[in-house]
Amino acid sequence: MSTNICSFKDRCVSILCCKFCKQVLSSRGMKAVLLADTEIDLFSTDIPPTNAVDFTGRCYFTKICKCKLKDIACLKCGNIVVYHVIVPCSSCLLSCNNRHFWMFHSQAVYDINRLDSTGVNVLLRGNLPEIEESTDEDVLNISAEECIR
């Protein structure tokens, strides 16, 4: 994959929250489409959500490709809000993708644009650190600031 063809650096970063209970699930979300069916909108992230979700049920495979998936539920309300691509198939890995393997169902989450350090501009994926140290307190502070806006 060439980064010139598949660049996601200008995409907005979102805070993702559970629609059912408003629990903050991720502060590194990005709007995406399902590779196997581009009519399906969703959100994705590159880092697993912590202290907000957990695996549920058994692994399964899609009908369109051979990716191995597992559902993930919100710890606060128990609703399935995410699935994790545990083993991506070669077809999906070779296609233009963002290397995100945590996929949030658009009907189960809502997004809030995350602001950059100035608090004025929307944070873009290209300006997001590859790995962020976050604690529950950090996520709650982000959520409170964004909810007030």
From Swiss-Prot:
<dbReference type="Pfam" id="PF14976">
    <property type="entry name" value="YPEH2ZP"/>
</dbReference>
<comment type="similarity">
    <text>Belongs to the FAM72 family.</text>
</comment>
<dbReference type="InterPro" id="IPR026768">
    <property type="entry name" value="YPEH2ZP"/>
</dbReference>
<dbReference type="GO" id="GO:0043231">
    <property type="term" value="C:intracellular membrane-bounded organelle"/>
</dbReference>
<protein>
    <recommendedName>
        <fullName>Protein FAM72C</fullName>
    </recommendedName>
</protein>
<dbReference type="GO" id="GO:0005829">
    <property type="term" value="C:cytosol"/>
</dbReference>
